[in-house]
């Protein structure tokens, strides 16, 4: 959808949002390289710029020739890095709807649940020793 609104799609990829927003954002599960490769595989992405901090992102916004900035609709009524700069400099803000229910928080929750189930299954398959055997083992 975004590519229909622009000629050149530049994607900014943050290394780790917890660097300057700990406790607010989640640490990425995948490495920056893995995420970069996934973006690179998308036929609509023309260029990927990697940045570390929100300050770095603002510098990218200020130094690139941008006409439109795409954000998730969850940012519509929030303040965010570069919002005022975009408004002041005629960079259109386009808020897109999330067409899916995937999120890193939900993925973490599912992964933790499955890992917990796996650990419980493993523990339940361990042989249970009698208290007499446990006592004998402790005497050695």
Where are these regions (language model features)?
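Nucleotidyltransferase catalytic core that binds NTPs
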Residues: 1-140
């Amino acid at each position: 959808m975004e590519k229909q609104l622009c000629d050149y799609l530049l994607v900014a990829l943050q290394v780790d949002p917890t660097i300057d927003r700990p406790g607010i954002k989640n640490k990425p599960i995948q490495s920056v390289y893995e995420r970069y490769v996934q973006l690179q595989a998308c036929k609509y992405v023309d260029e990927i710029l990697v940045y570390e901090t929100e300050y770095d992102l603002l510098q990218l916004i200020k130094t690139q020739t941008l006409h439109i900035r795409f954000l998730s609709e969850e940012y519509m009524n929030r303040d965010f890095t570069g919002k005022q700069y975009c408004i002041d400099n005629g960079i259109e803000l386009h808020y897109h709807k999330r067409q899916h229910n995937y999120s890193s928080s939900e993925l973490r929750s599912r992964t933790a649940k499955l890992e917990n189930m796996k650990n419980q299954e493993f523990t339940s398959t361990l042989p249970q020793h009698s208290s007499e055997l446990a006592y004998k083992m402790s005497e050695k």
